[in-house]
Structure formats: C-alpha cells, structure tokens
Amino acid sequence: MSSMNFNPFQNWFEKPPNPVPSINFVSLADSFFPKSQSPNFASIGLPKFSKKSPKPETAGTDEPGPYKQIAEQFLWECENIPDYRHTPEVDKLLNEDPVFEKKENPSTEEIEAEQKWWESFRASPVVQFMTRAEEIADDMNKMELEDNDTPYRKEDKDYWRAIPHVPGFDGRPMPRKAIKSKEESDDKFWDFMKQFLFGLWGFRQRPYPPGRPIDVAQAIGYKRLEKRYYDFIMKTGGWWYKDRLGRSRGPCEIITLKTAYGAGIIDRDTFIWGEDMDEWAPIHMVYGLEPAIATWEVRLGAAATAFLHKLQKGIPPWVPLKGREPKTYKQLQKEAIESKKRDMAVLEANGGVWPGVRTPSHALFLWASGSELTTVLESDHMPNKFIPKQLRLELAKVIPGLRPWEVISIEQAMDQISYGGEWYREPLGTYTTGPPYIREWNRSVMRLFRIFYNLSVRVGQKLERTVPGFDTIMDKVQKDYDKRIARRMKRREEELREEDLKHYSGRTDEDEEEEEEEDDDSNSKKD
C-alpha cells in the first residue's frame, strides 16, 4: 500500500540530527558516487528509465479564482477595516458644488467675464422676482415656526423646543403643528382612539396622510405619557433584551433588568422587546421604560461599574467613551444628516454599490439610521458578522424592500425566514398607509356606497309601485331636505365670513371673550 507525503518539509518521520553527528562513511562514499534522490514515500511504479519528463507548469495556474479572491478580500477587510467613507473621492464629491463646475486656474479675462455674467443675471427682472419670492417664502416659514413654537401642554415647552425641525424638500425646516385649543386636542385624541381600537380588535384602520399623522402624544402630553407608561411598566413583566452578541435573553422582570443595568450588561441603547410591542426598540425609546429601570441607585451602580472599566483600560474617568459624548438633539440631527450625505457620496463614487465584500458589523443593526446610535455604531467595535450573498437574496424575497444592514443578526434573520413556517406578526412591508393602501380603502368604501345606494334606490322604487301615495311623501321629504341644506350652507357662509374678518382684523376668540365679559360687567353695574 502506498502513502503520500503532503508535508513540504521533507519526510514525516525524519529523525532529528544529534547535537554532535558522527561520521557517516556511507554518505561520504555516496558523495564521490552520486545517485538519484529517492522519494520520501513508498511508491509502486515503473523503473526510472520509463518515467516521462515532467510537464512545464503554466504561469496562469498560480492566479486565484474569483471565490478565493473574494475570500482573501473579506479576510483583509476584517483585519484592516478600511474606511470607505473618508476617501479623497468622497471628500471631493462632498466639497464640490452640485450645480456649477469650478474651473481651476482661471485667467483674468475669464474672471471678469464671469463677474459680468453674474451681474447681468442678477439684474434680470425674472431673477429678482424669484429671489423676492424666496425671501417671502422664508419669512412665511419663519412666521409659521414662531406660531407653532409652544405645544398644547405647557410643561412640554422645553422638550418641544429642544427637538430640531426636520428639513423639508426645499431646505426649509418643516413646522410641527401645535394644538391650539381644547376642542382640537379632544378631536385629536378621540380620532386616534377610534382608529386605535379598530386596529386593536383586528379591523382595518382608516388611512391618514403619512405627512400629517394624528399627534395624540401632544394632546395627552409627553411627560404625562412618561408617567402613565411608567405606572404600566412597573406592573408588567416579561421583557427580552439583546445582549452584545445579538442573542435574545429573557423573559426578565424589572428587577432583573435593573441588576443588568447596574452591572453594565445593558444600557439605554440596548434593544428590548415586550409582549405588546411590534418590534425591538432601544430602552430609551420606549415610554416610561428607562425611568423604571435606571433609577438613581441603579444609575449610581452603573456609573461605578463604568468607572472601574475605565480605570482598567487606562481611560480618565472624566473622559466620555466614544459615541457617548453628551450632545443636544440639534447636534445629533446635524451629525445624522452629514453621515447620510457621506453615505450617498460613497455610493455615488462607487457606481451605486457599497465597496468591499464585508458588511460592517454596525450596519447589521435594525436601527442603525437612528441619530442617537449613529456615533456608537459607526465606530465598528462590535463583533464582526457577515451575511452571505445567498442569504441576502433570500431576505430580499421574504421581506420586500429590506436592506442587508437592517438585520440585527444572522440569528434573527434565520428566525424570520424559518419561524416554523409562520409569521408571528404581519410581514414587514405588507401593512402601510401609503398610496396602495389608500387606493384599496377608497375602492372598498366606494363599493359599500354603491351597494347601499343601489339598495335604497330599488327599495324606493318598490315602495312607489306597491304603496299608494308614497311618491307624494318622498317629494315632501326631498323639499324639506333641500331647505335644510340651503339653511346650513347659508349659516356656513356667514361663519366663514366672520372668520375672514377676524383674520384680517387681527382679532382672536380671547379678545371677543374679554369684550363679552366687559359687556356683562357693564350690564350688571347698570342693573
């Protein structure tokens, strides 16, 4: 039986030389009469003279294949972690003007010609009109922001003003509509409550414009919501959280979460899930959960644990960890917008595809686009994970519109694909209030309207044929209906006319109430 040696360093069982080797007369004689080198393994073959000369090796066999190149590239990226977001091409795209091209080293004549062109451009009546229109639009936007700078609940004023406005498509901040009166607050609350109960009981909810959702949180009050949810959370149990490896831990009671928080196992950015939650969410994004867990003694224990960890790593205690710097909402929004622009510049510089083979580990988190987690996750200090291309394709089929970096971990992705062949909630992307849902809702409403309309018409025709004098009664009902509609239209026109007069005169309901009170006082004095 033959055996082969795959060891590149001579024989498997070669005896190591002694410290002082003795004189070998056989090898000395062989040095004067050299012989052919015998192989280091037993072989059964033909004699020497029957062996063919070895074929020359081609130069192309040393080149790795495409899969080996991908594997080598992936291993190199895991070891070096290249930063594709800060390259000269990306910085150039961010710094250059999106409209005008900057010419390098222009001559004096070109500079003067450009200045003359700009002067003639600004002197154009059309350009001046458009410039004035933009100034008026800016002033109107500023007035609308000032008109909505105070929420309905006075205790939420600081929180309301600390949150920055979202920039709109035209670059101007979009104002958040503040609730002005108690009637409007009640309408918001009950409008939300009716649709909420419909969804709670399994019925379809009425669609609302995505740009103007029902702001029931402002009507109730943000601080009141914190307190109400705090009372509810203190009475409930059964929480699951994601550890630093992405595994689900639970169920846990509040006291268990407090212990984990004090020991540094979880923090305010840890993803958590409760029995009545639709998705995993960070602890600080769940109403009332962070105050229930991070009480003063728990925060004191967590600070002591963090202090010890900093001392072990040689970090000064007063220096915050990377990504944990205290920042305002405005700073977080600015960093998130700049990060998004840089990501888009990376895609533009690489033909619409993110470069490299390895998916960054911070990009595997579901809420990676959240401004509160951007600085933490972009540091890429978490365990390296890799989603193969085949799994990405399966995820794209199962979850429409899903991107690879919107998955918490491989474990969650496989759970979503093979959760016993069933979903424990509606598949992502199926329930929306966008245009398709609104079109379907309108079709259903029109179908019901046609059914009841045709039914009422046919019932009326049947009664007219069978009941004598029914047509006379219907004529009288129709005349009364027309008179009632005419009275309502006239009353509504008067109300609109009064509202226009109040708007142009600058009068408010409070002024009218004060005048009515003064009239009542004067009448009482006369009496």
Swiss-Prot record:
The keyword Mitochondrion does not apply. The keyword Aminoacyl-tRNA synthetase does not apply. GO terms for cellular component: chloroplast; chloroplast envelope; chloroplast inner membrane; plasma membrane; plastid. Residues 1-48 form a transit peptide. Residues 491-508 have a biased composition (Basic and acidic residues). It is found in: Plastid, Chloroplast inner membrane. Its main location: plastid. Residues 509-521 have a biased composition (Acidic residues). This is Protein TIC 56, chloroplastic. It comes from Arabidopsis thaliana.
